[in-house]
Regions:
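Divalent metal-coordination and catalytic microenvironments
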Residues: 9, 22, 27, 53, ...
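Short catalytic-loop micro-motif centered on adjacent basic/acidic residues
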Residues: 95, 125-128, 235-240
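C-terminal cap of metal-dependent C-N hydrolases
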Residues: 9, 326, 380-446
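Metal-associated gating/positioning segment near the N- to mid-region
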Residues: 51-119
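A glycine-rich helix N-cap at a beta->alpha junction
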Residues: 114-130
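His/Asp/Glu-enriched, well-ordered alpha-helical/loop segment
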Residues: 203-224, 228-233, 283, 304-311, ...
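Histidine/acidic residue-rich metal-binding segments in metalloenzymes
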Residues: 136-311
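Histidine-rich, glycine-flanked metal-binding segment
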Residues: 1-5, 10-58
Length: 448
């Protein structure tokens, strides 16, 4: 069995930060030491990595990605985007069902598992898509293999709108598993489109996006979902929260293990605000839209006070030409997974979060919320999903170092002040010194 000692990094884990060492045996963490690793342990290792001056954290768990496989692979695929993931310190991902075909049958879910086993450099998992008429398929799901159901409560990329009241009642009442939602009120969006096109015509610029996909569209839909989940005693997870108003629907009075209603925020809503549309244009067009600087401040505070439980990406690559055109025509979404951890570390450097909070929201809490088997922490017996950070690396995002298949990033030209030095996936070096190890394959994530 391969034995690796990672010696003398600063370990950031479970709210603590200390100089220590980690012993990896095979695909698991065998021991965690404070201070120097014992000499006999070091002597028995096949490899000793001197990580002095580096930081060691558990691999990031991203609960919302769109890797575009199958059917949309001109934008990205499981192979290419998992390469970007490990380069960004993401070791397990949860992929969304709005592909072609949509992941709304057991057969299509199995196709994704088989494809990921062949090509994914990171550990993999897939949400199952709920529709107006696939309750029989939902009942057949193996709950240990999927993180939950994904419902689109508005028309967004992929057109998987679930809009029949009886279908929603049945899913929330009978699914017996976590339900993750994209919450924007379809009627409000359509009304806003009608209003602004009547005033300004069809060729609306990007500044109208946050007016069309407005605060009220988000709040109304989230509030209705919370009411339904509360009434039917369901587990509800609201994805990509974008407004201060929605935060009133969530609570930080209970530990995560007791929460039935939880929330996620994405890095772009913590980084950008609507004043950035003038500079970045359609590159920062997402659904839900980027909102005000006040919303951004409230979302940051909600991460710090635990009203928001998870930070993720909604990684959704499109080709540059698909991002062109008016507000109503340009594709929504963008590639983020290679830069999500680094972005959060940059915000921590600015004093917005502690580094311990970044690790909590990107690794620990996803593992807890989704009840993932032995991932998300630096603990003996857990899978050795480990990221080593260089806290002194200064580098600029450019086309030369972007790994997304789509070839661009909203962070192009930005200089970051931390870098991912090495990423281990199940004890194997998946990324190191700027190179992806394409021989590594991730494992299927399991749920308890």
């Amino acid at each position: 069995m391969n034995k690796i000692v990672i010696q003398n990094p600063r370990i950031i884990n479970e709210g603590r930060s200390f100089i220590g060492s980690v012993l990896v045996e095979g695909d698991k963490i065998a021991a965690v030491f404070e201070g120097e690793v014992p000499g006999n342990v070091r002597a028995e290792a096949n490899q000793v990595i001197d990580a002095t001056g580096k930081w060691l954290i558990p691999g990031v768990i991203d609960d919302q990605v769109h890797f575009r496989d199958p059917g949309l692979t001109h934008k990205g695929d499981i192979g290419t985007e998992s390469r970007a993931a490990v380069a960004g310190g993401v070791t397990p991902f949860m992929d969304m069902p709005n592909t072609k075909p949509q992941t709304t049958t057991i057969a299509d879910l199995e196709w994704k598992f088989n494809r990921a086993a062949e090509v994914s450099r990171a550990n993999y998992s897939f949400f199952f898509g709920g529709t107006n008429d696939n309750m029989d398929e939902i009942r057949r799901l193996d709950r240990s293999r999927v993180p939950g159901l994904k419902l689109f409560l508005c028309s967004s990329s992929g057109n998987m709108l679930v809009d029949k009241k009886d279908s929603l009642e049945r899913i929330f009442g009978e699914a017996g598993m976590l339900i993750a939602i994209h919450a924007e009120k379809e009627e409000v969006i359509r009304r806003n489109i009608q209003y602004y096109t009547n005033l300004h015509g069809e060729d609306l610029d990007i500044s109208f996006h946050s007016k069309i996909r407005s605060e009220e569209a988000c709040y109304q839909c989230s509030a209705e979902a919370v009411e339904l989940a509360t009434r039917l005693d369901s587990r509800l997870h609201i994805l990509h929260l974008s407004t201060e108003k929605e935060l009133s629907l969530l609570s930080n009075h209970l530990p995560l293990s007791e929460k039935k209603i939880t929330g996620e925020v994405c890095v772009h809503h913590l980084w950008f605000h609507d004043g950035d549309y003038a500079q970045f244009g359609n590159r920062i067009k997402w659904n839900p839209s980027i909102k005000t600087i006040e919303d951004r401040a409230a979302l940051r505070e909600a991460v710090n006070n635990n009203t928001i439980d998870i930070v993720a990406t909604d990684h959704a690559p499109h080709l540059p030409e698909e991002k062109q055109g008016s507000c109503l025509k340009a594709a929504s979404g963008g590639p983020l997974i290679q830069h999500s951890l680094i972005t959060m570390l940059e915000l921590a450097m600015e004093g917005r979060f502690t580094y311990e909070k970044v690790v909590e929201k990107m690794a620990h809490m996803p593992a807890e919320l989704f009840r993932i088997d032995r991932r998300g922490y630096i603990r003996p017996g857990y899978y050795a999903d480990i990221v080593l950070i260089d806290p002194e690396q200064t580098w600029t995002v450019s086309k030369e170092n972007i790994l997304y298949k789509c070839g661009w990033s909203p962070f192009e030209g930005y200089t970051f002040h931390h870098g991912v030095w090495k990423t281990f996936v199940n004890g194997e070096l998946a990324y190191g010194d700027g190179e992806v190890n394409d021989a590594v394959r991730g494992k299927e994530v399991r749920y308890l």
